[in-house]
C-alpha cells in the first residue's frame, strides 16, 4: 500500500510538473511573440517620426537614443547610428517580464535604413541653369579630396565632377578644374524639371526664414542643418557661415562674405562680384527671368562629396523600399 501510494504521488507530481512547464513555456512563447511585435512596432514608430534634425546634428558613428511606448504600453528602447551620411542602423529592443514567472523575455530587431534626399540635380561643383560669368581670379574645381578634418573621415571615397555644368560659361580656362572642366547642359529643360521636383521637398523639410533685404544672423551651428531664406532679393552684407543645406528662394547678392560647407541652392540669380563666396560642397542655381550667374574675384567653389551628402541628409527621409532585417530571438 505504501509503495502504491508513493507511485501515485510520484505520478501526480510528474503530471503537475509537466503541466506547469507546459504553461510556463506557453507564457514565455506568448511573451516572446509580444516582445517581437513590440520591437517591430517600435521600428515603425521611429521611421514614421524620423528625427532628421537630431540625427544630422551628430557626427558619423554617434548613436542617437530614444524611448518609445507601444499602443498597449510596452516600453521600447530605440538606437540610431549613422555609419554613412545617407545610411543609418536602427535597433529596437524590448524586454518583457513573463506573466507568472521571474524570467525576462528580450527581443531586438535591427534594420539598415537608406535615407532618400530630394533629387536635386548636382552635376558639377557649380550647376547652373543659365549662363555663368567668372573673372580671372574666380576658382572652381570638381576635384574631390579627403583630409584629416573631413566629416566622413580621411579614408572616404572621392569623386571628380565637372567644375561647371551650365548652358553657357564665360570664364578663363584656368578658373575651372575638373573632368571635364566644363560640361555644357544641352537640355536644361530636364535639369530644371528635376530641380522643380526637388524644391518643394527641400522647403517642406527645412526651416524657413523670411529674409527680404539683408540676411542677418546667419551663423554656423554645431552639426548640419537645412535653412531656406525667402525673399525677392536676399543680401549678405556682413560675414556669414553655414554648414548643411542653405537654400535661397529669390536672388542672392553677396556683398560681404559667405562661407558654406555643404550645398548652396539659389532659386534665382547669384551675384558675388563685390564679395567673397567660399563653398566646400556644391552650388546649384536655377534662376527665373535673367538666368545669368555673376561670380567675382573672391569666389572659391571646391566640390566635396562628403559635404554634399551630409547636407542632403538634412532633408532626407527613410526610403520606402524594403529593408534588410535581422532578428535576434534571445540576447
Q: What are these model-predicted stretches?
A:
Residues 1-3, 310-324:
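N-terminal segment of the canonical double-stranded RNA-binding domain
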Residues 3-38:
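Aliphatic-rich helix starts adjacent to a transmembrane/signal segment
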Residues 9, 22, 46-49, 53, ...:
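Generic hydrophobic alpha-helical segments
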Residues 13, 36-37, 44, 124, ...:
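Active-site-proximal helix/loop capping residues that flank conserved catalytic or ligand/cofactor
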Residues 18, 22, 38-45, 49, ...:
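Short alpha-helical scaffold segments that flank and stabilize functional sites
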Residues 33, 37, 41-91, 180, ...:
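Low-complexity, Gly/Pro-rich coil/beta segments used as flexible assembly/activation regions
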Residues 81-208, 219-311, 323-331:
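Short, ordered "entry" segments at domain starts
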Amino acid at each position: 500500500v505504501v509503495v502504491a501510494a508513493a507511485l501515485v504521488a510520484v505520478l501526480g507530481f510528474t503530471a503537475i510538473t509537466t503541466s506547469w512547464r507546459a504553461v510556463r513555456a506557453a507564457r514565455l512563447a506568448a511573451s516572446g511573440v509580444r516582445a517581437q511585435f513590440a520591437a517591430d512596432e517600435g521600428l515603425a514608430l521611429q521611421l514614421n517620426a524620423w528625427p532628421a534634425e537630431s540625427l544630422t546634428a551628430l557626427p558619423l558613428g554617434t548613436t542617437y537614443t530614444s524611448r518609445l511606448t507601444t499602443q498597449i504600453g510596452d516600453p521600447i528602447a530605440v538606437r540610431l547610428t549613422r555609419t554613412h551620411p545617407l545610411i543609418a542602423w536602427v535597433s529596437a529592443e524590448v524586454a518583457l517580464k513573463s506573466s507568472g514567472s521571474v524570467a525576462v523575455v528580450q527581443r531586438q530587431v535591427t534594420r539598415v535604413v537608406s535615407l532618400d534626399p530630394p533629387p536635386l540635380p548636382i552635376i558639377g561643383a557649380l550647376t547652373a541653369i543659365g549662363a555663368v560669368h567668372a573673372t580671372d581670379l574666380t576658382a572652381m574645381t570638381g576635384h574631390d579630396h579627403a583630409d584629416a578634418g573631413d566629416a566622413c573621415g580621411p579614408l572616404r571615397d572621392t569623386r571628380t565632377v565637372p567644375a561647371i555644368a551650365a548652358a553657357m560659361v564665360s570664364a578663363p580656362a584656368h578658373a575651372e578644374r575638373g573632368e571635364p572642366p566644363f560640361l555644357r547642359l544641352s537640355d536644361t529643360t530636364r535639369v530644371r524639371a528635376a530641380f522643380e521636383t526637388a524644391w518643394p521637398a527641400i522647403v517642406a523639410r527645412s526651416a524657413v526664414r523670411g529674409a527680404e533685404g539683408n540676411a542677418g544672423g546667419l551663423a554656423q551651428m554645431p552639426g548640419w542643418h537645412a535653412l531656406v531664406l525667402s525673399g525677392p532679393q536676399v543680401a549678405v552684407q556682413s560675414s556669414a557661415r553655414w554648414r548643411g543645406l542653405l537654400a535661397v528662394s529669390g536672388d542672392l547678392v553677396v556683398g560681404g562674405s559667405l562661407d558654406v560647407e555643404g550645398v548652396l541652392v539659389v532659386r534665382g540669380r547669384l551675384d558675388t562680384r563685390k564679395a567673397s563666396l567660399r563653398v566646400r560642397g556644391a552650388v546649384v542655381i536655377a534662376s527665373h527671368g535673367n538666368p545669368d550667374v555673376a561670380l567675382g574675384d573672391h569666389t572659391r567653389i571646391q566640390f566635396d562629396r562628403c559635404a554634399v551628402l551630409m547636407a542632403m541628409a538634412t532633408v532626407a527621409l527613410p526610403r520606402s523600399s524594403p529593408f534588410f532585417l535581422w532578428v535576434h530571438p534571445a540576447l
